[in-house]
C-alpha cells in the first residue's frame, strides 16, 4: 500500500475499479468470446443448419461463467438471462459475426490491432468478474475459502470449464479436451487470481481490492495481448511450474520409469531364470538317460 501511495496509484486504481463495464467492456467480451466460437471446427456450418443451437453455444460462451457460479451457490441457473440488455447485445454480436454480409463485421474485428484492443478489454471484464464472484461467495460463506476460490475461478473461466458441455450442443464429443486436464493460460490465471482475491477478501493480503484489481488487470492484459499478438498457446506460468511441480508433486515420468524398471527386472529375471533352468534340467535328464543306456549295455 505504501508503494502504491508513493507511485500515486491509489487514486488511479480506485477510479479504474469504478469504471462501468456495460456496454463497452461487455461488448468487447462478447465479441472475443463469440470469435473463439467461430474458430471452432464446424461452427459456421452449425450456424447455417441449426441457428438455435449456434445461438445457445454463443450464449454459453458469453454467460457460462454466471451459470456455473449460480450452480455452485445454489441459485437459479437462468438468473442472469433476466438481464435483457446483455442478452440482446450478445445476440446482436452473434448475428453480426456469423451472418453479416460478406463477413464484414468478422473481418473488422479479426483485424489484429482491433482484436488486441478487444482482447485487452475482455481481460478487464474477466478480472472484475473474479473479484465480484468472490465477494458474492463471501456474502454466503464468510469462512468458506474453497467456496470463494471455486466461485471466483468459474467466474473467470466458466466457459472453458464448460467446454465439453458446449461441444455436446454442437454435436461434438471430445473428452480429451477437458479443460481441467489441459488448463489454458486464462484458466490457470483465473485460479491464481481467485486465490489472491480470496486472501484479500479474508484480510490475509494487506492490499485494497481496487489496487489488486488494477495490478492483476495489468498482468492479465499484458500477458494475453502478448500471447494473442504472437499467436502463442504457451503460458507464462510454465517456467515456474516446471520448477515447483516436480518438488511438490514429483516428476510425471519418474514414477512410471521406476515401475517400468521394476517390472522389467521381474520380467527380465523371470524368463531368464526359466530359460536358464530349462537347459539345466534338460542336461540332467540327458546325463541320466545316458547313464541308464550305459547300465543297459553293461547288463
Swiss-Prot record:
Residues 260-299 are annotated as: Disordered. Channel activity is activated by a change of voltage within the sarcoplasmic reticulum lumen and blocked by luminal high Ca(2+) levels. InterPro entries: TRIC_channel (IPR007866). It holds the Pfam family TRIC. GO terms for cellular component: extracellular exosome; nuclear membrane; sarcoplasmic reticulum membrane. Belongs to the TMEM38 family. Intracellular monovalent cation channel required for maintenance of rapid intracellular calcium release. Acts as a potassium counter-ion channel that functions in synchronization with calcium release from intracellular stores. Opened by a change of voltage within the sarcoplasmic reticulum lumen. This is Trimeric intracellular cation channel type A. It comes from Homo sapiens. The lineage of its organism: Eukaryota, Metazoa, Chordata, Craniata, Vertebrata.
